[in-house]
Amino acid sequence: MASTASEIIAFMVSISGWVLVSSTLPTDYWKVSTIDGTVITTATYWANLWKACVTDSTGVSNCKDFPSMLALDGYIQACRGLMIAAVSLGFFGSIFALFGMKCTKVGGSDKAKAKIACLAGIVFILSGLCSMTGCSLYANKITTEFFDPLFVEQKYELGAALFIGWAGASLCIIGGVIFCFSISDNNKTPRYTYNGATSVMSSRTKYHGGEDFKTTNPSKQFDKNAYV
């Protein structure tokens, strides 16, 4: 029962993390222009993995998609690949988890389901690591430019998508670890105490002993009468 409960908790935590990681891809605010050192702000610049936008003081936004993948900076291409890999791994981890959980009717025997659940945990951990690496790489680029005194272009701050990605990655890793530890509970063999033999023997001696006594007494009496 404890193993089933831990698997359900791990599944809910992992799915929540995967949903958060998936929501970072369409999120606009991966980085937002800083207002540090500016007196008058006429526009706000922000960008994600797919486009760069600017919002003026009236609230009108103009966006421009990145024209060519090969013309992009290397860190953006790496973040794209890592985040897409994280979402894909989380999807397959969810499928493996459904087959490996003991509360489901698919997956075969308990031993086979335990192995599938452990595999789901490993996949979720990899998904979390990919998301954590992608968000950290993007954040490292932002902070490096922000604290560089020789960088004269527009400086940015960390956007909300990075924090969502870090939170989702942490949940995926935690859920994956719980899935991996659940296999140890499934491999534990229960101990049985056998007390039936003593009770059976005592009952046999109780009921059959009297019958043997009754059947032997007439024969002894007959032998005595035969010699009189």
Curated annotation (Swiss-Prot):
Residues 102-115, 182-228 are cytoplasmic. GO terms for molecular function: identical protein binding; paracellular tight junction channel activity; structural molecule activity. GO terms for biological process: bicellular tight junction assembly; calcium-independent cell-cell adhesion via plasma membrane cell-adhesion molecules; cell adhesion; monoatomic ion transport; paracellular transport; regulation of monoatomic ion transport. Keywords: Cell junction, Cell membrane, Disease variant, Ichthyosis, Ion transport, Membrane, Tight junction, Transmembrane, Transmembrane helix, Transport. The keyword Metal-binding does not apply. It catalyses: NH4(+)(in) = NH4(+)(out); methylamine(out) = methylamine(in). Expressed in the kidney, eccrine sweat glands and in all layers of the epidermis. In the kidney, it is detected in the thick ascending limb of Henle's loop (TAL). In the sweat glands, it is expressed in cells from secretory portions, corresponding to the clear cells. One of its GO terms (cellular component) is bicellular tight junction. The chain crosses the membrane at residues 1-21, 81-101, 116-136, 161-181. Can form homodimers both in trans (interaction between CLDN10 molecules in opposing membranes) and in cis (interaction between CLDN10 molecules within one membrane). Forms paracellular channels: polymerizes in tight junction strands with cation- and anion-selective channels through the strands, conveying epithelial permeability in a process known as paracellular tight junction permeability. It is linked to HELIX syndrome: An autosomal recessive disease characterized by congenital heat intolerance, generalized anhidrosis, inability to produce tears, dry mouth, electrolyte imbalance, and ichthyosis. The fourth transmembrane region (161-181) is necessary for integration into tight junctions. Belongs to the claudin family. This is Claudin-10. It comes from Homo sapiens. The lineage of its organism: Eukaryota, Metazoa, Chordata, Craniata, Vertebrata. The gene is CLDN10.
